Regions:
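Acidic, metal-dependent phosphodiester-chemistry machinery of nucleic-acid enzymes
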Residues: 130-164
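Hydrophobic residues embedded in beta-strands of well-ordered beta-sheets
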Residues: 7-8, 66-68
Length: 164
């Protein structure tokens, strides 16, 4: 879930789910998200805290007639393991290019995505990046991304040919 100042991971475990994959999921979520939350059915409510770190929030969901009631068992806390470099890797190349533009950075068109991410990390404070990542994700348009990436690649190829 994208928030103005954070990206939150939400894992859902229904009453029919097991904990088999949860350890790997927790590890993955901890790398990318500023806060994490697990939503569980009532059968998991008593034991879920044994399976997620103390900074994870816990919500239970219970069917109540034709609706669902949610109860907060534990509020989420900031994730101490989030890796801003991994968080940046969620962004598509045109989104990274926009962050470079916002921060008046060189374009590095001929360089890899990893190179660009490293340069952004050197130049832009984490607090600024956190807000900019959220804004890029808010603006993301999944219906036009193929067109956006194709246009970005054409522009990159065209502009790089002038550098020769």
């Amino acid at each position: 879930m994208v928030l103005p100042d954070a990206v939150a991971g939400i894992e859902i475990k229904s009453d029919a789910d097991t904990y088999v994959r949860l350890k790997r999921q927790v590890s993955d979520y901890n790398r990318y998200y500023d806060t994490n939350l697990v939503v569980v059915g009532s059968t998991h409510a008593l034991h879920i805290a044994d399976h997620v770190p103390a900074w994870w929030g816990i919500l239970t969901a219970e069917k109540a007639g034709s609706t669902v009631d949610f109860y907060t068992l534990r509020e989420p806390a900031p994730n101490p393991k989030v890796d801003i470099k991994r968080k940046l890797s969620i962004l598509w190349r045109p989104e990274l290019a926009h962050i470079q533009e916002l921060n008046k950075m060189p374009k590095y068109r001929e360089k890899s995505k990893a190179f660009v991410i490293d340069k952004i990390l050197l130049k832009v404070p984490k607090e600024t990046l956190t807000l900019q990542i959220s804004e890029e994700l808010f603006q993301r348009d999944y219906t036009s991304i193929e067109e956006t990436i194709t246009e970005y690649k054409k522009k990159k190829k065209h502009l790089c040919s002038y550098d020769l």
